[in-house]
Amino acid sequence: MESTLSAFSTVKATAMARSSGGPSLPLLTISKALNRHFTGARHLHPLLLARCSPSVRRLGGFHGSRFTSSNSALRSLGAAVLPVIRHRLECLSSSSPSFRSISSGGGSGFGGYNGGSGGGGGGGSESGDSKSKLGANASDGVSVPSSDIIILDVGGMTCGGCSASVKKILESQPQVASASVNLTTETAIVWPVPEAKSVPDWQKSLGETLANHLTNCGFQSTPRDLVTENFFKVFETKTKDKQARLKESGRELAVSWALCAVCLVGHLTHFLGVNAPWIHAIHSTGFHVSLCLITLLGPGRKLVLDGIKSLLKGSPNMNTLVGLGALSSFSVSSLAAMIPKLGWKTFFEEPVMLIAFVLLGRNLEQRAKIKATSDMTGLLSVLPSKARLLLDGDLQNSTVEVPCNSLSVGDLVVILPGDRVPADGVVKSGRSTIDESSFTGEPLPVTKESGSQVAAGSINLNGTLTVEVHRSGGETAVGDIIRLVEEAQSREAPVQQLVDKVAGRFTYGVMALSAATFTFWNLFGAHVLPSALHNGSPMSLALQLSCSVLVVACPCALGLATPTAMLVGTSLGARRGLLLRGGDILEKFSLVDTVVFDKTGTLTKGHPVVTEVIIPENPRHNLNDTWSEVEVLMLAAAVESNTTHPVGKAIVKAARARNCQTMKAEDGTFTEEPGSGAVAIVNNKRVTVGTLEWVKRHGATGNSLLALEEHEINNQSVVYIGVDNTLAAVIRFEDKVREDAAQVVENLTRQGIDVYMLSGDKRNAANYVASVVGINHERVIAGVKPAEKKNFINELQKNKKIVAMVGDGINDAAALASSNVGVAMGGGAGAASEVSPVVLMGNRLTQLLDAMELSRQTMKTVKQNLWWAFGYNIVGIPIAAGVLLPLTGTMLTPSMAGALMGVSSLGVMTNSLLLRYRFFSNRNDKNVKPEPKEGTKQPHENTRWKQSS
């Protein structure tokens, strides 16, 4: 650790780049006006809509490159507004409800004052924190999510060899940089090369090209429509398709087992010595041939044909092995029946029983796959189908039930007790408690009142709420989570790369072993073990054993070992408020040995409260004017109203509590620097808010500045206020430590994980929090800026540490991105969630323990699956080849081998499903007291002023 700290001290002076401010006030005003105007025009006359269409086409040319003006501000305004107008008109002309609020969302991030954690930014509005509250990656603009990838729904994959072939086919295309294929979810995600994105409408054209190519190669594929309105329909369609395939599989299974039962009846009557005329018909060769043909041409037809087609196209799969085994048994038996003098045995019953056992295994496997996706289906089911739309503002007489997918931005919906919230939005009137457990995993209900954010799918428990819609349908936070989790499930864990290499060559290896088995027993077996022939010929025994080798091999178990465990793990996490973006993240997270916490908003609650405004004792000596507390708050709030930083929010709340006059920063003057502060022109005065260094940089002077540092005690941080070239005041804050922070740190330490804390605060404030939560002061790094946090993470990594960084604000974004695993608190800034592969949607530190335990249990399950899959094939193939025949006289018939093959796949699926129970039995936070969530009743901190709700 000492080497890390010493190395870090050499880079601590790194300068941090100045970030630009948010959009100017006029641009936001125009955006809001457009939003109100067009969302209010949903019921325009069709003639007017038709007349809008030519306008849409004409607006197509008004992009930034073609809208020219000598005025740079006008060019910027045109480039920003005209695409929005075009999008709105397109929505109207197609009667589409896909409006999005463009006026919400935080800005570019605001620095941590005197070491605050940072976050927020310019350009936010009264709903600026909606992104962070309603989920990671909740978009506030008109962009389409997942804009850099192509998702394909791929059918016809039956084993690991199939998924490896699909990946190889995709990556062989020049437009594809890399691809990832998930056998369990039957999807492929493609990352194209940069050159492919230069083509207009490249996603649609390239997606169709790749899908057609896969279809021609034997894998029926369709490109996924990435438009959010269609996402839920796609997900529902896939679920219905799986259910339909399961029903079809059930019918085929019933027919095959009926035929198998007839075969077994014949054997049973022969064994019992039953002698009746109809028994002779059942034992006749012609009857057995008929049963075998009906099986191969009926329930086994698809299986056999798919296997032969795959073999001819150079990508053999498990169906190829089963098909070859069944056809070989039928061919040899037919030859033996037609030429009795060969002395070969006939075993027409083997293909019948083989197909029956294989179809049984497939049916159980399909059921297990549907069960594995039940968590995702459960997430989808939390969204209601109907909503009560409020018309004319009359709650009593003007509500009408409408489909939820028809809701638009700006609509008002009424939510009665017991109803599920139909869309993401903001409460306009009413007060109630909301159950968000299906969304965040938070067991405690949360109080909601006017101005509170609500998420689609949460349950209204008592009062009536009127909510303004901000996002609906696939644009909701639940939709984002489902979409991100599905993409995460298609991201391969590094361990999967070994499996892909084996699975891609596995089928060829099995066919080679089958040929070797036939050669050995046909040429040498009779000499080595003549008693094994049982009055048959060497050729008959060799053919039977070689067929058993083909059938017993199970590439499907290899292909399912990793993706099924990842599917269950990520889906299980999503249902419990843990967003884990990929199998590679689960694997890394399971190996973490160092956890670095940000202080503000992570170890503390992130809701600082103004406790005191301090004016210098001799203001006339340092200032041109004397400033009152009200004036200081009024000026500081004018600057902070442009941010969503917790400190900024606290200042604005304090100003409102004192009924300060509302002032605004002059347009285009707001500037900020994460980790330092912000400055703007207010009422012709340059107002600086931030750290002491920041205020000095902007010209504030006076010896009393240093004396004011003494006011920063314990966990109370300060922000300096400068007006022009003078110090106006210092504002003190208090931010309480999370109730579960100490227990989480203790738990991590007990597991042998090194725990550090990074903070932009001064040493005494950071040490106070460290003392409360139990972090050694030697592992507290205070007074650091965002770039320095990133450098510290890099130093730990140079010392071979696997680092997880836990943070919540834009100040943490660089450190989160550079760590091995970035963990964002769900209530933090959107940028933190966007760069973090792990998001704790419930905004509770105990979820960190859940996420780590889930990753460990998932990887443990993956390893168990791989041991089983490899072990089964390593043991099963030699037994099928007759290795026990000289020792014990034991051999596997093709039908017995088929039954074992089904059991192997089912074992992998069952073990993956058991992950649910293992996770709950090993959770580390059973004794951790749940932390009261924001909005629940709890004692208020003692402050100088009572804060308004």
From Swiss-Prot:
EC number of this enzyme: 7.2.2.8
Binding site for ATP: 807-814
Catalytic-site annotation from UniProt: 598 (4-aspartylphosphate intermediate)
Main subcellular location: plastid
Chain residue ranges for the region called Disordered: 113-142, 925-949
Similarity comment: Belongs to the cation transport ATPase (P-type) (TC 3.A.3) family. Type IB subfamily.
Protein name per the record: Copper-transporting ATPase PAA1, chloroplastic
Source organism (scientific name): Arabidopsis thaliana
